[in-house]
């Protein structure tokens, strides 16, 4: 865009990332009034607002597009300049990726191990629900996202990773306490279950599809940890939908049991990333796709 000063967008990025004008000024080593002036210059240039001035400040839809552009340029710049200057002392490149909790708890870290140990990179693995992570890529907050969405957004690719199979499990003791009469509409409404957060609809969808039970008809804990799901189930506190990949040993040993045999919840997941990638970003995408396709059911 002719006439667009990237210092203006840098100020916008700092305000959003730091949660306010004062901390943005500290980050940029300029005065708070200078930060405000740069934002105003950007809005004057575009003839529209780029920032919702609340606490904390949030970008408008136009602001999100600008931040996406700016962050892509920064990543490419970070990789290209040290190469052009033959500089081996550059700081690690900082990358944010959006993932669902279950992928992080099972296969994602092994997929990224080689890149994380052999390249100068600092990763921020931000956890979002499978249906929400794509929004973070749209806004430019992350450079890649694991999502249930198969269609890529503009300027991006969507590579199929594989299938996540979920099993509804409980401990034998829990099963005897709550499901001695069988797993059905009546018993499921009295047994405590677990969801990740208010956005997690996997469990509710499973109960609705197979038992015609609505969300407000069950006892449901919210626990924001995939690893805690396993502990809750093993401890006999609740029954849970857990990725089969995560509990193969527990199922084999009988510590956990499949309480709805024949009913499997499966989701196809995709890796969304920019079409034009190079350097460590390209390596990350290749590592994720290759590892997932080798270890997840297709």
UniProtKB/Swiss-Prot annotation:
The keyword Metal-binding does not apply. Keywords: DNA-binding, Transcription, Transcription regulation. The keyword DNA-binding applies. Residues 21-40 bind DNA. Residues 4-60 form the HTH lysR-type domain. Pfam families: HTH_1, LysR_substrate. One of its GO terms (molecular function) is DNA binding. It comes from the Bacteria. Controls the transcription of genes involved in arginine and lysine metabolism. HAMAP family: HTH_type_ArgP (MF_00513). Homodimer. Belongs to the LysR transcriptional regulatory family. This is HTH-type transcriptional regulator ArgP.
């Amino acid at each position: 865009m002719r006439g667009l000063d990237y210092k203006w967008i840098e100020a916008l990025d700092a305000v959003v990332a730091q949660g306010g004008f004062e901390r943005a000024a500290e980050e940029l080593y300029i005065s708070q009034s200078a930060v405000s002036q740069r934002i105003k210059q950007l809005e004057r240039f575009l003839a529209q607002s780029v920032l919702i001035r609340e606490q904390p400040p949030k970008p408008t839809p136009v602001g999100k597009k600008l931040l996406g552009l700016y962050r892509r340029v920064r990543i490419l710049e970070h990789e290209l300049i040290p190469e052009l200057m033959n500089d081996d002392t550059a700081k690690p490149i900082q990358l944010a990726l959006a993932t669902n909790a279950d992928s992080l708890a099972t296969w994602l870290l092994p997929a990224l191990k080689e890149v994380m140990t052999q390249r100068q990179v600092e990763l921020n693995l931000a956890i979002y629900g499978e249906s929400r992570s794509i929004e973070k890529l749209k806004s430019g907050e992350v450079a890649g996202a694991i999502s249930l969405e198969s269609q890529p957004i503009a300027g991006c690719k969507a590579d199929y990773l594989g299938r996540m199979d979920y099993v509804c499990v409980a401990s034998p003791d829990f099963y005897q306490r709550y499901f001695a009469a069988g797993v059905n509409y009546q018993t499921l409404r009295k047994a405590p279950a677990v969801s990740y957060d208010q956005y997690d609809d996997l469990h509710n969808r499973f109960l609705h599809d197979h038992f015609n039970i609505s969300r407000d008809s069950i006892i449901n804990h919210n626990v924001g940890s995939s690893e805690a799901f396993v502990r809750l189930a093993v401890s006999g506190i609740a029954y849970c939908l857990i990725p089969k990949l995560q509990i193969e040993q527990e199922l084999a040993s009988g510590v956990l049991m499949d309480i709805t045999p024949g009913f499997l919840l499966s989701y196809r997941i995709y890796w969304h990333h920019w079409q034009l990638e190079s350097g460590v970003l390209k390596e990350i995408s290749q590592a994720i796709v290759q590892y997932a396709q080798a270890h997840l059911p297709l």
